[in-house]
Amino acid sequence: NLMMRFVEIIMAIPSLIYIILLMVVMGPGIKTIIIAIAATEWTSMALIVRGEVLRLKEQEYVMAAINLGASPSWIIIKHLIPNAMGQIIVRITMDVPRVIFTEAFLSFLGIGVPAPFASLGSLVLDGYRLLSNGAHLFIIPAFFISLVTLAFNLLGDGLRDALDPRLRK
């Protein structure tokens, strides 16, 4: 319960504020972006995993393993992790577009990936600055961000349909 209260406190403030604050404190860079995004994105995964484990804990096969004297670590390894893995994989594929968009947004603001490295957000920013020279410099990276986001959302939706036993017919 203590960890969930901590997660709720972190989730009460928009993650973009945390990320921008960490970017300002730690300076721009790829490592900083990875740390900043990972420091905020784990909270939604924690809620999903907790809910799934609480649901699985009430299943008959888990209760049978407990009654037969199985150790908690054995139950976690043999029952909870394999049965929660589908939800975890689906959640990861649904989180990837948000992470890509967050990184692109930070780079568009100029606090993301530094200049020698390419980023979708920095490409959109460069295209925006040169919009009068050619709209394609702005449209192509923006379209690619949309395409990647759509692809990962469709992948996550397909994986959810394939891995969720409640949706199987």
Spans of features found by a protein language model:
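Glycine-rich helix-loop "coupling/hinge" segments at transmembrane-helix boundaries
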Residues: 11, 22-27, 37, 53, ...
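Transmembrane helix boundary and interhelical loop/hinge segments in multi-pass membrane proteins
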Residues: 52-61, 159-166
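A short glycine-centered flexible hinge/capping loop motif at secondary-structure junctions
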Residues: 68-70, 114-116, 166
